Each structure stands twice: as structure tokens, then as C-alpha cells.
Amino acid sequence: MRAPEFWQNDPAHPGWQSRLLAPLGALYARATARRLAKGDPVSVPVPVICIGNLNAGGTGKTPSAIWVAERLRDAGHEPHVVTRGYGGTLEGPVQVDPRRHRAEQVGDEPLLLAAFAEVWVAKDRAAGTRAAAAAGASVIILDDGFQNPSVAKDLSIVVVDAAQGFGNGRCIPAGPLREPVATGLARADLVLALGDAQAQEQFRDTWGAALSVPLVTAELKPLRTGMDWAATPVLAFAGIGNPAKFFRTLRAEGADLRRAEALDDHQPLTPALMTRLENEARLLGAQLVTTEKDAVRLPPAFRSKVITLPVRLEVAEEDRLRAILLAAAPPPP
């Protein structure tokens, strides 16, 4: 499902569609508040760092979780990620094994994260954190658990796409938010805004006055793998929260983007779909390229035919964010 364009209107001028849907947005916000108030959070004997967002859809949580996991491991931790496993069939808690699990079972994000840390899929997030702690985690990264009241958190990071900000500031379906900005940030410890300098300036201008917690800025940058994208003809496809950002990155790298296919977030990459894309790429004389997250959903027969453009987080104040992480999760002795 594509997000309506009016979700990205200026908060001061949300549009008639948003105003029409505002009563439903208020009901959604109240339902979220009631669910959060009824929560009885479980505490585990290791620190829990939550990485979530206020917006529905993709804001960059997965690369943020990867960055956090790598820094915690560098500090001597044994980080485990606990995630719901969106799109997967397994209820869990189950420890993800990329050698035997498929995206249809555990979801695409857990398979990607499993390259950087131990990962647990659990529809019951509290049970997942208990399983991770029992299996030897020294710190738990709770992926997309900000609106989940079942687990006590030691540090809550709200990730936001700086270019999109918090949209028109309204709750679903009047806007993109899972809960109002003020109430959400009241539970947060930090906002991590992802975007280039222009997007960061725009975010501060629009939302700076609403930020009640520290702001750290970062940007997603292509990982240097030796691939020369300059003038490379490509047919790009992406089933992530913000496919346009992926296509812009390819253009910025100099790729000759012959065609861009925006898929729904987590859309299955069926053999029929991939055969169509392969045929179109052949007609265009283009190389198929996708994101790391989409690549884990590729049918086996197509994995050698598609290349990826991996991205990694570059944090402007890396030492500051590392210090915040280690204050919440001191390194083990």
C-alpha cells in the first residue's frame, strides 16, 4: 500500500483529506495511548535498547539497528536483536538461522540483521527478550518496539527520515503517525534523524521546536564494495518503505537508471515477478539491482542475477551517540 501524498503535506496545511480523516486519526491516537497505558512491561537482566519510530513505514530503523549492534559489539557486548519478524509465518521465539530460514518464515529484515548479530523473531516481544537473555545476550536491541509496552526499555531511540519528518503531524489515517509527536517523544530518549544536510535543515526548521529530547543526525551512504556504478545501465527494483530514496542513491552514484520499479514494502518477489523484471532488463540492456533487504527475498534461481547496493549509517556525532549507548548498556567486565 502506497502512503497518500497528503500525509507529507506541511503540518500547518495538512489538506482537506487530512482534516476529513482527523476524527479517525484521533481515535487511532487514543487507541494507541490506551494500549500503552495498559502495558505491564517485563524486565530482563540485561539492558534493552529500543529502536523505533513514530511514522508508519520505513524510516531507516534497520540500518540504524545494524550500526548500534556493531558499536555494541566493538565495546565487548554480545548483542542480540529481538524483532517481530514482519511478513514471516513463525510465531517464535525462534533464533534466526540464515542457513535454514527463509524470508517467508522469519521476514526479510531479520535475515538481513542476522549477518550482524544474533536475531530472535518473536510475535510476543517479551518472550523474545527473555529467550535472548537466556541464550547469552549481554544487551538486547528491540527492533520496532517503541509502541510495544510489553518490554521495559533502558534507552529508546526514535528514528526519523529527515526529508519526510513527521509528515503532516497527524495520526493514521489522517497522516503517517502511529501516535502524536508530543506523546511519543515524551517516552523517547533520543531522536536519530537520517538525511543529507539539506534534509536535516528542513527537519530542524519544521520540527525543531517540537523536539523535547536530544537530536543526533546521520546519513545513509553507499558501502564501498569496489562496484563502479558510473554509467552502468540498471533496472532497479525495491520493496522497502521509501523506494524513491534507493533510486535517488543509485542516480547519485552515477548509475544509468533505465527503469525504476517501486514495489510495496515487503512485497513477495515471486518467480513470475522476477521473470518479468529479468525480461525487461534484457530488453533495456540493463543490470538488475536491488536493496540488501529485498535481496534476501529473492527466489534462489535469481540470486546470482541481481546485484545489490548496500548502504550503511554514517553518524555525524559518532562519539556522542556511542557514549549514550554505553551509558545505557555499560560494557561487560
Swiss-Prot record:
Name the pathway it acts in.
Glycolipid biosynthesis; lipid IV(A) biosynthesis; lipid IV(A) from (3R)-3-hydroxytetradecanoyl-[acyl-carrier-protein] and UDP-N-acetyl-alpha-D-glucosamine: step 6/6
Note the SUPFAM superfamilies from the entry.
Answer: P-loop containing nucleoside triphosphate hydrolases
Give the keywords, sorted.
Answer: ATP-binding, Kinase, Lipid A biosynthesis, Lipid biosynthesis, Lipid metabolism, Nucleotide-binding, Transferase
Checking Pfam families in the record gives: LpxK
Q: Is Transmembrane helix one of the keywords UniProt gives this record?
A: no
Q: Please write the reaction equations for the catalytic activity of this protein.
A: a lipid A disaccharide + ATP = a lipid IVA + ADP + H(+)
Any idea of its EC number? Answer: 2.7.1.130
Listed GO MF terms: ATP binding; tetraacyldisaccharide 4'-kinase activity
Q: Which InterPro entries match?
A: LpxK, P-loop_NTPase
The Gene Ontology biological process annotation of the record reads: lipid A biosynthetic process; lipopolysaccharide core region biosynthetic process
Which EC class is the enzyme in? Answer: transferase
Its cellular-component GO annotations read: plasma membrane
Question: Which residues take part in binding ATP?
Answer: 55-62
Q: Which family does it belong to?
A: Belongs to the LpxK family.
User: Tell me, what does this protein do in biology?
Assistant: Transfers the gamma-phosphate of ATP to the 4'-position of a tetraacyldisaccharide 1-phosphate intermediate (termed DS-1-P) to form tetraacyldisaccharide 1,4'-bis-phosphate (lipid IVA).
Q: What is this protein called?
A: Tetraacyldisaccharide 4'-kinase
Q: Which organism is it from?
A: Ruegeria pomeroyi (strain ATCC 700808 / DSM 15171 / DSS-3)
Q: Which gene encodes it?
A: lpxK
